Each structure stands twice: as structure tokens, then as C-alpha cells.
Amino acid sequence: PQHVHQGRVMVKLLEDMDFPVFVLSDDIAEAKVQTQVATQKAREINGPVALVVKKDTFGKFTAPKIDADLPMSREEAIMAAAEVLEDNAAVICTTGMPSRELFEFRARNEAGHHRDFLTVGGMGHASSIALGLAMAQPERPVYCFDGDGAALMHMGSMAITGQSRAKNLTHLVFNNGVHGSVGGQPTVGFNIDMPQIASAFGYVTANRVTTKEDLQKAIISSRLTDGVTFIEVQVRPGNRADIGRPTSTPAEN
């Protein structure tokens, strides 16, 4: 729903900031002319211009597949994690597919959605929201279900979380090596040592898991940790084509 409003105000917003705006045509010949004119304009003003692309302007494209011989999909990992959470645990879930998968898991199990905050349209902000909740409710276990792309997008928040020493917060990053919610473009998630980064930020424990058993053990062990816990869950890229969207609003939760 946030994209409807963003799309409605996009051109005016750019014009108000004095950007030359070109709405890209879906006619290839006209689009080529527009890009040439836009490029020339950028050179003339020695500054940026905006090419606004409407929905369905481009055809479908399959991104190169990332090879990952891992036992779990992200959805399977989210289900495995949710199975062992305390009854009073709060879950702050990152935007996109992870929130949709968690919502469907709760619906299938008739578990209700009252413990979950789905960070729809707020990529990269889930961990900050989770930290705020953990500080406000120190007696309540709080879990952040994050993605590799989202965590990398606002990694500065991990430094703040690591230095917070919040004893009731566990930060899980479901790392599938791609931006899975917006086309499958690769991240650098599989090329870096996320637990080592988390340790440098001050997380008390930081582990990497790939199996359901190790994931659930790590979550249960996190309850005994005297500080913030980080768990990287390496999973296969991809998601179900028929995954639904949340049918309730945050206010209804």
C-alpha cells in the first residue's frame, strides 16, 4: 500500500527538489530518445536527472541464480525459528517476503498475529525497532527476523544494537545471498563474515547456522546470554510463487 502513495507523489516530489524529470515511455524507440535527452540534460546542468519508470514498463527478467547448497529455504528457517519462541516473545520481522512467510505460518497454525510487527515498507529498520522494544520491555524476549540485504542496508544500526547490551534481544539474519523480495539481485551476504562483524559491534554471542536443529538450539541458548545475541541463518534463495500478503494492519494487531 505504501507504494501507491509513493507512486502518486513521485513526480511532484522530484520536481519540487528541482530534478529534471522524464517519465520513461514503454515504446522502445521513444525511450531511447528520452534517455539520450536525459543524458544530455545531466551533462548540461552537471547534475542528476530522474527517469521515472511506471509499473509494467519492463518485461519479466529472470535474475542469474545464486548457487547455494543449503538444507533450508528461508521460509523453512522462519518456521523452525518461530516454533521454539516463548509464548510472550515479540517478533519484529523485516519487510517483504520474510514478513509474508511469517504471517502465513501464524495463520496456518491459528496462532494469531498479536506478537508480530511486520516492518512493511521499512527495509533495514527492523533491528532498530526491535532494539527499541527490547529496551522498553526488558522483561520480554524480543526477536528480530532480519534479511541480509536489509541488515547490510542500515548496518550502522547493528553497531548501536551491539553496544546496547540488551539482554532480551536476539537478532537473526536469514541470509540467502540475494534481495529476494525485489527480484533476486545478489547481495554480498555470502561473501562476508556476518558473525565476525556482529562480534566486532559488541554482540555477546554471534553464530552461523544452516540446519533446523542448530538454529533451534542457538535460539534456545540465546535465552541464557547476558547480552545481545546474533544468529546468521544461511538459507537457499527463492520463495513460493503463491505466497500471500498480510491481511491485517499493524493497528489491528
Each model region followed by its residue ranges:
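Short beta-strand segments
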Residues: 24-25, 50-54, 92-94, 145-146, ...
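Thiamine diphosphate
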Residues: 100-177
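Glycine/aspartate-rich loop-and-adjacent alpha/beta segment that forms the canonical ThDP
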Residues: 48-87, 224-253
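Conserved thiamine diphosphate
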Residues: 2-37, 185-221
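Short acidic, glycine/serine/threonine-rich loops at helix termini
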Residues: 1-2, 60-66, 102-106, 155-156, ...
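Internal alpha/beta core interface subdomains
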Residues: 15-21, 31, 44-55, 230-232
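Active-site diphosphate/adenylate-binding microenvironment
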Residues: 62-123
